């Protein structure tokens, strides 16, 4: 079976050449097949979030190569990777736009993952019904609050919404960075 994700000698150093230099990831190689479920364990500051950031494209590694489904994505911008990679952040505030409504956040996630561009206000009835059904499945009553700003949600509600946003269109890879932190 071909690798879904392959990292080859990936390294990332922050503030290189300064007194604050920090090697967050050093010469890491791994291969994951489709369907693999992997847990990365390490103490605070061990580089787990840095690893996820490099895979998701939040920043580029200093060295090495990242391949997703055989495609070299090492220097592919984050917005292009987000069509294939779903992500939940350690901080639930990072996964949503708090001043936008639940529906607007879902629309952004849906359009991004589907690779479509559309003015934000243009969400058809079909999409609204789809969003409502998916929200109802969470059992949190958010389907009745689709016009409410996300900033009014609790941390747990926002994290559940972020998970839904990351999986509205099934990603090839789902990264969960301390997703229960909320």
Give, region by region, the residue ranges found by the protein language model.
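A short, flexible loop at the N-terminus of ABC-type nucleotide-binding domains that lies
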Residues: 2-4, 13-27, 58, 75-77
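A short, proline-enriched helix->beta-strand linker immediately N-terminal to the Walker B motif
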Residues: 167-172
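Q-loop/switch helix immediately C-terminal to the Walker
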Residues: 99-115
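Walker B catalytic motif
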Residues: 178-179
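The feature captures the beta-strand-to-loop junction immediately N-terminal to the Walker
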Residues: 41-43
């Amino acid at each position: 079976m071909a690798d879904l994700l392959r990292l080859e000698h990936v390294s990332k150093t922050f503030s290189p050449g300064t007194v604050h230099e920090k090697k967050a990831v050093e010469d890491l190689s791994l291969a994951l097949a489709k369907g693999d479920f992997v847990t990365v364990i390490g103490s605070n500051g061990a580089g787990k979030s840095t690893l996820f950031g490099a895979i998701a494209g939040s920043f580029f590694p200093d060295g090495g190569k990242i391949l997703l489904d055989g495609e070299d994505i090492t220097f592919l911008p984050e917005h292009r990777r987000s069509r294939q990679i779903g992500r939940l952040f350690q901080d639930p505030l990072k996964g949503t736009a708090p001043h936008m409504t639940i529906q607007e956040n879902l629309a952004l996630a849906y359009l991004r993952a589907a690779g479509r561009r559309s003015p934000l206000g243009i969400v058809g009835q079909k999409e609204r019904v789809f969003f409502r059904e998916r929200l109802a499945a969470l059992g949190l009553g958010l389907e009745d609050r689709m016009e409410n700003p996300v900033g009014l949600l609790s941390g747990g509600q926002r994290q559940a919404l972020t998970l839904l946003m990351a999986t509205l269109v099934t990603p090839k890879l789902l990264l969960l960075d301390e997703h229960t932190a909320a």
